[in-house]
């Protein structure tokens, strides 16, 4: 048994403490709305129609709640004891309350004047309660609902949390589900479990979910093991992966390989010369997209319009715009100096990427991967049938698709091909519950679906096909139906005698 000292592992993401530092990736949370940003000094962030700077969150621990004050400054929110139900004056019935719009004495001009004076949202909510003629007549539950509604409107409270698979998957599913193929967060959790994602594995992943599945696998593996990502087009899309904020040590076990070179790798005709044109395309995509900071700035300006805009008719172009450079030291030519230095840096990156592609090809050629994860917008059948050859026997594979019919076809093809067992097509059912004192119940609105999963295990085929065995068993059953068993034939004459 090898000791842990022989294999030094990667350093933890936040050594020593859980404080927010300059350059970290964080997630801003307000009620049920999330947004992932990178912490930078004097960087203007727009979130939920409010703008502010992130300077004051540096040094605070994750989970701290801040209040947006005048001038875009964030101030830590002090926790105050809420009044208990015994001190509240509440009515017993809401039937006598008439909603005529005249119960509030404060007008919109009065509220605007309070905001202009710099009065905090908490004080505005308190004045709204005091100037409401029907507040004390409402039941205790109605009062809590009223206060919660007014706090959401007038109090600008933002909580800074650490990025995780669950938080980022909830964020993408709520704001831009098309970029992750409408994969719900519980479906992603099922994929990680069925795929047996753990530290030390050698995994293959083919996904077009903006890098969310890849980031979830990297988080669960903790920097131990290796992941080979197969990508279509000019380069891998890792916008969601960058939001995790993984350290550089996590990237040492991450490899990439173009999907259009898989057939040549299976046929044994793959060579290094075939990769000569690949890095040039990736560099041009990165050059056209700009850095991560420029991309996030443009996202902040168009934040509200993105959520309401229809999906693009060209998903490949839409995803290519999300490509993020893996090298944080890389700079655009306008920042790196002369054009000659930029060309040399570009050539160095191309050679380095070509080397990583060759390393990925060598890992795939061993055909001993510990698992396969497929979650793409393409038809799963040809992808799975070709990629299963790289997986070792007795290893799991999981395929995600937004629709059931492609997975049914894939299920049939796998049965005909053989070499797999325990095939299972599943769909998870998720329902959220409101859990509050004396009023816990399922929420009225719920998700209609989170996609479908096809899972199974690989086995050694021993050069045998599945079809003849299936047909022989079927023909045997048919012969038993048409002809009586021999034992029953012998018993019939004995009973007559």
Curated annotation (Swiss-Prot):
Keywords: Nucleus, Phosphoprotein, tRNA processing. Heterotetramer; composed of two copies of TRMT6 and two copies of TRMT61A. Belongs to the TRM6/GCD10 family. Residues 79-102, 311-354, 478-497 have a biased composition (Basic and acidic residues). Its main location: nucleus. This is tRNA (adenine(58)-N(1))-methyltransferase non-catalytic subunit TRM6. Residues 69-102, 276-354, 468-497 are annotated as: Disordered. The modification Phosphoserine is found at residues 298, 305. It comes from the Eukaryota. Substrate binds at residues 349, 377. GO terms for cellular component: nucleus; tRNA (m1A) methyltransferase complex. It is found in: Nucleus. The modification Phosphothreonine is found at residue 107. GO terms for biological process: mRNA processing; tRNA methylation. Residues 94-104, 145-154, 175-182, 415-423, 434-441 are annotated as: Substrate. Substrate-binding subunit of tRNA (adenine-N(1)-)-methyltransferase, which catalyzes the formation of N(1)-methyladenine at position 58 (m1A58) in initiator methionyl-tRNA. Together with the TRMT61A catalytic subunit, part of a mRNA N(1)-methyltransferase complex that mediates methylation of adenosine residues at the N(1) position of a small subset of mRNAs: N(1) methylation takes place in tRNA T-loop-like structures of mRNAs and is only present at low stoichiometries. It comes from Bos taurus. InterPro entries: TRM6.
């Amino acid at each position: 048994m090898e000791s842990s000292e022989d294999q030094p592992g990667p350093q933890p993401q936040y050594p020593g403490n859980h404080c927010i530092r300059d350059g970290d990736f964080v997630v801003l949370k307000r009620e049920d709305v999330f947004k992932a940003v990178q912490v930078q000094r004097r960087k203007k962030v727009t979130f939920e129609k409010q703008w502010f700077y992130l300077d004051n969150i540096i040094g605070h621990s994750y989970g701290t709640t801040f209040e947006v004050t005048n001038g875009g400054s964030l101030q830590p929110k002090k926790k105050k004891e809420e009044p208990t139900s015994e001190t509240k004056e509440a009515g017993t019935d809401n039937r006598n309350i008439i909603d005529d719009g005249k119960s509030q004495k404060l007008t919109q001009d009065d509220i605007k004047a309070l905001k202009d004076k710099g009065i905090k949202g908490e004080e505005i909510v308190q004045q709204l309660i005091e100037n409401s003629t029907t507040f004390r007549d409402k039941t205790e539950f109605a009062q809590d609902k009223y206060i919660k509604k007014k706090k959401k409107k007038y109090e600008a409270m933002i909580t800074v949390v650490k990025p995780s698979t669950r938080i980022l998957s909830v964020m993408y599913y709520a704001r831009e589900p098309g970029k992750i193929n409408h994969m719900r967060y519980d479906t992603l959790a099922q994929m990680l479990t069925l795929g047996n994602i753990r530290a030390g594995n050698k995994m293959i992943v083919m996904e077009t979910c903006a890098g969310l599945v890849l980031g979830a696998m990297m988080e669960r593996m903790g920097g131990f093991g290796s992941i080979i990502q197969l990508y279509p087009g000019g380069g891998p899309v890792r916008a969601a992966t960058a939001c995790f904020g993984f350290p550089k040590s996590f990237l040492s076990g991450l490899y990439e390989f173009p999907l259009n070179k898989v057939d040549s790798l299976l046929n044994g005709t793959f060579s290094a010369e075939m990769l000569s044109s690949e890095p040039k395309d990736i560099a041009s995509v990165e050059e056209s997209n700009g850095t991560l900071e420029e991309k996030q700035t443009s996202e902040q300006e168009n934040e509200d319009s993105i959520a309401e805009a229809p999906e693009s008719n060209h998903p490949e172009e839409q995803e290519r715009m999300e490509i993020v450079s893996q090298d944080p030291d890389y700079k655009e030519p306008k920042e790196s100096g002369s054009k000659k230095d930029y060309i040399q840096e570009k050539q160095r990156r191309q050679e380095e990427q070509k080397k990583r592609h060759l390393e990925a090809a060598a890992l795939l050629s061993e055909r001993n991967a510990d698992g396969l994860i497929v979650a793409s917008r393409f038809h799963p059948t040809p992808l799975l049938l070709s990629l299963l050859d790289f997986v070792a026997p007795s290893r799991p594979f999981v395929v995600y698709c937004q629709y059931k019919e492609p997975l049914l076809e894939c299920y049939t093809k796998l049965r005909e091909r053989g070499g797999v067992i325990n095939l299972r097509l599943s769909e998870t059912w998720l329902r959220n519950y409101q859990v509050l004192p004396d009023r816990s119940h399922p929420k009225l609105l719920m998700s209609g679906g989170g996609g479908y999963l096809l899972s199974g295990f690989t086995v050694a085929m021993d050069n045998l096909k599945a079809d003849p065995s299936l047909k022989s068993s079927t023909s045997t059953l048919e012969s038993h139906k048409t002809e009586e068993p021999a034992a029953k034939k012998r018993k019939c004459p004995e009973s007559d005698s």
